[in-house]
């Protein structure tokens, strides 16, 4: 589906990935999904590596601790090369998602309080990657927030969110 979307969009697909949480007891456990964070992290890392292999358009044989693929070829190949960008989401200030994101193309830190925290994110990722060139930092704020401080802190993408008050 990712390669199809990349082709149909003319190369504008971005894959977002994160561990997820079972806060309400309905997001993971209701479907029998793994609940241990470390195991889910290992599964995510393996899955992203496998997806990257599959995007190559070459024949893939993979036998990992969590996933198997035997003689699989994905076509069409993505328009974007060397691959579709991958953005990693994670709760600030947890370090594991930052380390994971530094290996990919972007980071969407959840629960940032202010631009200074985004600046801290940027510094950590720069220290891991050596540069922020070609790397996206995504922020989510209220629609009436001023983007200038976030841009100065390193934001490359801006998402506006609306809170729906269901009590009224």
Residue ranges and their predicted role:
Residues 1-168:
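Active-site-adjacent structural elements that line small-molecule/cofactor binding pockets in enzymes
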């Amino acid at each position: 589906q990712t390669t199809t979307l990349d082709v149909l969009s003319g190369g504008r697909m971005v894959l977002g990935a994160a561990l997820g949480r079972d806060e309400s007891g309905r997001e993971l456990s209701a479907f029998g999904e793994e609940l241990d964070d470390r195991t889910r992290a290992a599964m995510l890392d393996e899955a992203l590596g496998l997806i990257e292999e599959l995007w190559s358009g070459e024949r893939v044989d993979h036998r990992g601790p969590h996933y198997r693929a035997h003689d699989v070829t994905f076509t069409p190949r993505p328009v974007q090369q060397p691959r579709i960008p991958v953005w990693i989401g994670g709760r600030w200030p947890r370090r594991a998602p930052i380390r994971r994101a530094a290996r990919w193309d972007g980071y969407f830190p959840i629960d940032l309080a202010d631009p200074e925290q985004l600046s801290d994110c940027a510094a950590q990722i720069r220290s891991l990657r050596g540069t922020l060139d070609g790397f996206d930092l995504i922020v989510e704020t209220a629609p009436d927030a001023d983007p200038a401080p976030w841009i100065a802190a390193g934001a490359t993408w801006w998402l506006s969110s609306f809170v729906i008050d269901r009590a009224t």
